[in-house]
């Protein structure tokens, strides 16, 4: 191991990932100009995932530092539980899924961005099928990452996220939470506390879509219809409710602007009367999603008290 290279802790939660995890791990082991330590938490897989990981650990003992077999049955809690088992001795940290392919320069590129003054790196992905044939990209976002965006939208998957020790410590201190997803919560925490987030419009991950993905991509008409349905039945509202509960416990960590947004949006989404609402209320609070369509849906959800 080259001690002059940055040391990155890979935070990987697995469940029945035997079909693709070997390619995922190999793509991480082949990363340019970094050293990696794997921490893997397996949520009671039944398909041989653990055996594959153990074989890697036997072959590369210096790279595999933690392997845990748990019974949680929840990907978000599996990730956050694993965060609690890792120390803060690493230069950088990165979430990893079990079925993607990382570009060889993913970590090196992300670290370069972080070293320019950012705390959390995330980005777009290239969508591929089980045979790695490309068929699109995750949505392209152009508005800056901020808490005003994070409170209403997650802009990137955890499989793209790389972060410094400050974000890791913040996340570890706020990991015993009831939230929907580890990546959205990481984005919310980072922006709520005033840390700088960088969204990369150039993909560094092949995001594999197959029959067993926990979360699918956002592309395609059918997926958009599903998300509209979720909004109308109040699923997004329940997720945001959880975020508000957890943020209310750490208001002392929020910036002045974040707290203003937090309280004003809380008043707006919990108003007593359906029609007591105007577009000026949204502009005043400053919340926004990344696309025109997304902002239209946000306004509709707020109007219907489903935000």
Where are these regions (language model features)?
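C-terminal subregions of glycosyltransferases and related glycan-biosynthesis enzymes
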Residues: 179, 185, 208-307
């Amino acid at each position: 191991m080259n001690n002059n290279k940055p040391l990155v802790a890979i935070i990987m939660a697995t469940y029945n990932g035997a079909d693709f995890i070997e390619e995922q791990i190999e793509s991480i082991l082949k990363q340019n100009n970094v050293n990696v330590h794997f921490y893997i938490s397996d949520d009671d897989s039944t398909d041989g995932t653990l055996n594959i990981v153990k074989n890697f650990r036997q072959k590369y003992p210096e790279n595999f530092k933690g392997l845990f077999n748990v019974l949680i049955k929840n990907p978000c809690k599996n990730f956050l539980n694993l965060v609690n088992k890792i120390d803060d001795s690493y230069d950088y940290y990165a979430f990893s899924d079990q079925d993607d392919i990382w570009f060889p320069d993913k970590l090196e590129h992300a670290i370069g961005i972080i070293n320019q003054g950012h705390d959390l790196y995330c980005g777009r992905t290239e969508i591929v099928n089980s045979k790695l044939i490309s068929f699109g990209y995750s949505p392209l976002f152009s508005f800056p990452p901020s808490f005003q965006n994070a409170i209403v939208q997650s802009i990137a998957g955890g499989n793209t996220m790389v972060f410094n020790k400050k974000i890791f410590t913040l996340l570890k201190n706020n990991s015993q939470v009831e939230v929907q997803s580890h990546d959205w919560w990481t984005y919310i925490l980072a922006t709520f506390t005033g840390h700088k987030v960088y969204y990369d419009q150039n993909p560094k991950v092949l995001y594999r879509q197959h029959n067993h993905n926990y979360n699918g991509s956002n592309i395609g008409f059918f997926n958009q219809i599903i998300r509209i349905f979720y909004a109308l039945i109040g699923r997004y509202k329940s997720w945001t409710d959880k975020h508000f509960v957890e943020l209310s416990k750490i208001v002392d960590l929020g910036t002045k602007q974040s707290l203003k947004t937090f309280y004003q949006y809380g008043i707006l989404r919990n108003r007593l009367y359906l029609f007591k609402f105007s577009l000026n209320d949204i502009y005043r609070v400053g919340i926004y999603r990344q696309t025109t369509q997304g902002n239209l849906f946000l306004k509709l959800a707020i109007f219907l008290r489903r935000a």
